[in-house]
Amino acid sequence: MVILGKLMARRLFLSSLLTLILSLMVAGCGPKPKVTVAPAFRPVAAETVYIVPFTGALVPETFSETVFNDFVDLLNGRRRETGVRSFAILKDEVGAVDVGWLAQQHYVSGEIWSYVEETGCCATNIRVKVRAYLTEPGKRVPSVEIFLPMESFFEHDKSTIDLERGRLARNIARELAVRFSAALSPRR
């Protein structure tokens, strides 16, 4: 009887350990934030960097508005670090802006996609991916690309979906602003 108990405890321990290891391996396979900077990119003090409204398919409008507006506000708060005099919002989509004029400007564009809310009886997980680009004057290919996959998990008795959407949107805006500021900083 004692031997059977030790054997059972050992199997339980080993199966728990195997489950933990496999869980860590699977969690490590998810997408990671990534900043790609072209080798030829050298930050320069720019008068104005224009920011084009981010595109978003199947993303709640208030969510994408919060990401975009907070991102612009945070970038403007970091102007001194970046050497940029101002970050200005272009009111039109990229396709509506004069291509010749835009090609002569520094501008940021981006997209929010893969927004998923998985709700169960007691908790919700929100996942979203964001990609933003900085394109320099005269270049067709962006010089800086930032990819951010982010998520928020919460229990329904601790928070609400609206609060968590707002929190996640503000976190994304903050991460984008920090990473763009670092890329634009002359002290890179």
At which residue positions do the language-model features occur?
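A structural detector for beta-sheet-dominated domains
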Residues: A38, V52, R131, P149-E151
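Surface-exposed short loop/turn segments
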Residues: D92-S143, F153-S159
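Short secondary-structure boundary motifs at beta->alpha junctions and helix caps
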Residues: N125, T135-P186
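A structural "domain/chain start" motif
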Residues: A27-R80, A177-R188
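Second-shell loop/turn segments in exported
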Residues: P53-T62, T119-G120, D157-L163
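Short beta-strand->alpha-helix linker/helix-N-cap micro-motif
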Residues: N76-W101
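Sec-dependent bacterial lipoprotein signal peptides
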Residues: M1-C29
